[in-house]
Structures are given as C-alpha cells and as structure tokens.
Amino acid sequence: MNMSYLFFFFFIQLVLKYINSKVTENTICKDGFLIQMSNHFECNCNPGFVLTSESTCENKVECNANSLDKRCGDFSKCAYKDLQQKELTCKCIDGYDLEESICVPNECKNFRCESGKCVLDPKQEAKIPMCSCFIGIVPSKENNNTCTIEGQTECTLKCTKENETCKKTSGIYKCDCKDGYTFDKEENACISFSLFNILNLSIIFIISLIYFYII
C-alpha cells in the first residue's frame, strides 16, 4: 500500500469524523449559532442557510433544473420526485425521514417527546433516540423520559463575545446581547442602544443633507 493511498485514507477518515462529530458547548457552527436544550446542544442556521451536517450550514436553494443535489432544507436536498426524472422536489438525505414537514433522524420517526424534541443521545456512539426538552421542562422517568414535568437546566453555553450573555428564548438557551445592547451586523458585535441610535441618526442626517443639496 503506497503512502499516497494511506494519506488519502486517513484524510477521508478525518473528514468523516468531523462531519459525524457530536455537537457540544465547544462546537463552532459554520454560518449558524449554537443553542442548548435540556439534554443536548445543536446548531441553528442563520437566515438563508440550512443544515447539511450537525455543525455546518449551507446556502438554501429552491429546487429547479439547476439545483439537483443542492440543499433545500435542513438535512434535505433537491432530488427527482420519481423514476421518470422530470420534476425535482425537496427530499430528506440518507439517514433522515420526513415527519411533520421536518427531516428527523430515522431513529426518531414516531418518537414522541411532548414539550421537546427527539434527538440522538450525544453520549452514545450508537444512534439511540432520546428526548431533549425545552428549557423549563425536563424528562420524566415516570413517563418514559418524555418532557412532561417542570425543571431547571443550567445554561453552559460559552458566550464569550463582549456584552454577550446566555438568554432563554422560545424554550432554548442561546448567546445574545445583554440588556441595553443590540447586535450590529456590520460590526459583528453587541453595541449599546445609545451608540446604535447615534449611528442611525448620523446616517439619517447625512442622507438628508445629500437629498437637500441634490434637490
């Protein structure tokens, strides 16, 4: 076996390990952001992006003649609707099944969690389905570990940017700007409302001056 083949083999193994790696509080979500529920972490994508793996987002496309195999939704791609290959539709990728318009792991098909969602146990190498609850709810041992009782989950997200903190939003934890600050896309940072308002007023003033002199 020559060295180039060995190198290629190990490179492929590293890529597969990265793609299939579990999402933790240390995961960096490409073109997305990390959230936490009661029993797991996951990446959510920025607007206009969809999940292609547990930690990677890509541009979302509409299925048409030029978008075969491209990503049209989380864990889904554009594929031919039938064997006649005349029409493309958005289908779940291998390993996922469609349930209530969402592509879920095969093992989570028909797996009910009540106030939460089915995920694959991040502590197991095998694909074992389990419930992860919305923040404020925890699994109940009396009810097959479904999300049915109130309970607290500590936020362990690493919100390290300046003026950033962990916040509960719509049943999840995520890193967000502290009270009194707002996120500025151009600066990619949380800035104070007062500074944000000053910048906006300055822009409005400059535009008004330009408009005045043109007219």
From Swiss-Prot:
It is found in: Cell membrane. Residues 1-16 form the signal peptide. Disulfide bonds join C63-C78, C72-C90, C92-C103, C108-C118, C113-C131, C133-C147, C155-C166, C159-C175, C177-C190. Residues 193-215 form a propeptide. The keyword Cell membrane applies. One of its GO terms (cellular component) is side of membrane. The keyword Lipoprotein applies. This is 25 kDa ookinete surface antigen. It comes from Plasmodium gallinaceum.
